[in-house]
């Protein structure tokens, strides 16, 4: 008699995706982040669903409803901080997942990589709209500044901004539609994740060496499920430590003040996970140029498979490329720091140098160093 998980039409799909999936035996803990992202998404959808039961998307009551959740709802404070800090954990895992893809050449699976970049855009859009919902000072001014960037688009810019706002400023209509989209997008993300996995399972997983490992496969369960469980325990420990001890560590104190259109905060900045892109945006004095650079800072990921000039897929055996990769990481950390600083000397010039270096490393230096590595290996 055949095992039901191998014969049942629905269970067979789950079995082939998560249980009997042939997986390279050499993949390291850097491959844990895919499953961690799935768990983060589940946590966000569940906590978000319960928060939505108590939240009201009206400018007069949004701030009060969030206060009500924290004070009057059973474990409402925990739901709220799990959701807010869960977003931070989501982005930490996301950036590490992308970093692993860059380091080990996973971008050579072009379809999987491209869907991943679309997923990144969808998650960033969801997080931005979620940040607006508590209707604090930083929520309101963040929404005003970021949506206003679209006015840089020639000819249709102003009309486009007013269409998104649903009026002549960020107001009730904006908050209502942002809540609707913030609720809807995670389910679109789930669909995209399924497509992402579909393309991944067409080719199979990459491995640290970048060499095909068809001869050395092991079943996903129990070997990698046990390994992923360790990553999960570490992530849950960090998340609970954040939620229970320092829930506001990554937030902005200004967001505890109700939104006031007549009072601009001294320093408008997004959540920490957008600071690198915000720094690139601010580094260019021209508005349209800044918006284009902001978009390109993420879109450049789509070009990476075409900029790969090496004979070797992974950076494991390319020491010069490794140095450049860690330089890029340091550069991104510098941009994140600059994004949180006021617009004054010396932060302006540091931001401009780091922004130029970001694009220079990805578009020019990486392909050149790949060619140098290729030449040295021949030599």
From Swiss-Prot:
InterPro entries: Cyt_b/b6_C, Cyt_b/b6_C_sf, Cyt_b/b6_N, Cytb/b6-like_sf, Cytochrome_b, Cytochrome_b_C_euk/bac, Cytochrome_b_N_euk/bac, Di-haem_cyt_TM. The chain crosses the membrane at residues 33-53, 77-98, 113-133, 178-198, 226-246, 288-308, 320-340, 347-367. PROSITE patterns: CYTB_CTER (PS51003), CYTB_NTER (PS51002). Signal peptide: none annotated. GO terms for biological process: mitochondrial electron transport, ubiquinol to cytochrome c. GO terms for molecular function: metal ion binding; ubiquinol-cytochrome-c reductase activity. A ubiquinone binds at residue 201. Its main location: mitochondrion. Heme b b566 binds at residues 97, 196. Heme b b562 binds at residues 83, 182. It is a multi-pass membrane protein. It is found in: Mitochondrion inner membrane. GO terms for cellular component: mitochondrial inner membrane; respiratory chain complex III. Binds 2 heme b groups non-covalently. Pfam families: Cytochrom_B_C, Cytochrome_B. The keyword Heme applies. Keywords: Electron transport, Heme, Iron, Membrane, Metal-binding, Mitochondrion, Mitochondrion inner membrane, Respiratory chain, Transmembrane, Transmembrane helix, Transport, Ubiquinone. Its cofactor is heme b. The cytochrome bc1 complex contains 11 subunits: 3 respiratory subunits (MT-CYB, CYC1 and UQCRFS1), 2 core proteins (UQCRC1 and UQCRC2) and 6 low-molecular weight proteins (UQCRH/QCR6, UQCRB/QCR7, UQCRQ/QCR8, UQCR10/QCR9, UQCR11/QCR10 and a cleavage product of UQCRFS1). This cytochrome bc1 complex then forms a dimer. Belongs to the cytochrome b family. This is Cytochrome b. It comes from Scotophilus heathii.
């Amino acid at each position: 008699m055949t095992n039901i998980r191998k014969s049942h039409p629905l269970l067979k799909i789950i079995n082939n995706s998560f249980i009997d999936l042939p997986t390279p035996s050499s993949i390291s803990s850097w491959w844990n982040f895919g499953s961690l992202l799935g768990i983060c998404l589940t946590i966000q959808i569940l906590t978000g669903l319960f928060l939505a039961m108590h939240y009201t998307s009206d400018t007069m009551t949004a701030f009060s409803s969030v206060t009500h959740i924290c004070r009057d709802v059973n474990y409402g404070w925990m739901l709220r901080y799990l959701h807010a800090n869960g977003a931070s954990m989501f982005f930490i895992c996301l950036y590490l997942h992308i970093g692993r893809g860059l380091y080990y050449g996973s971008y050579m699976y072009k379809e999987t990589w491209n869907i991943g970049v679309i997923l990144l855009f969808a998650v960033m859009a969801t997080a931005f709209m979620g940040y607006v919902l508590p209707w604090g000072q930083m929520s309101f001014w963040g929404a005003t500044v970021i949506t206003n960037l679209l006015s840089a688009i020639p000819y249709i810019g102003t009309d486009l901004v007013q269409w998104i706002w649903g009026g002549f400023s960020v107001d009730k209509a904006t908050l209502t539609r942002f809540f609707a989209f913030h609720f809807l997008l995670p389910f679109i993300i789930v669909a995209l994740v399924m497509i992402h996995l579909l393309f991944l399972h067409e080719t199979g997983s990459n491995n640290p060496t970048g060499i095909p490992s068809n001869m050395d496969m092991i079943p996903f369960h129990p070997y990698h499920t046990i390994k992923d469980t360790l990553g999960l325990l570490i992530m849950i420990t960090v998340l609970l430590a954040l939620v229970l001890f320092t829930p506001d560590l990554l937030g902005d104190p200004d967001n505890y003040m109700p939104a006031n259109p007549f009072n601009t905060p001294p320093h408008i900045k997004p959540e920490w996970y957008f600071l690198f892109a915000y720094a690139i945006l601010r580094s260019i004095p021209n508005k349209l140029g800044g918006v284009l650079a902001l978009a390109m800072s993420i879109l450049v990921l789509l070009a990476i498979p075409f900029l790969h000039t090496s004979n070797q897929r992974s950076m494991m055996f390319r020491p010069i490329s490794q140095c450049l990769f860690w330089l890029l990481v340091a550069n991104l950390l510098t941009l994140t720091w600059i994004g949180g600083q006021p617009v004054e000397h010396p932060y302006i010039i540091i931001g401009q140098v780091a922004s130029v270096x970001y694009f220079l490393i990805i578009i020019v230096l990486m392909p050149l160093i790949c060619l140098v590595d290729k030449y040295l290996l021949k030599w």
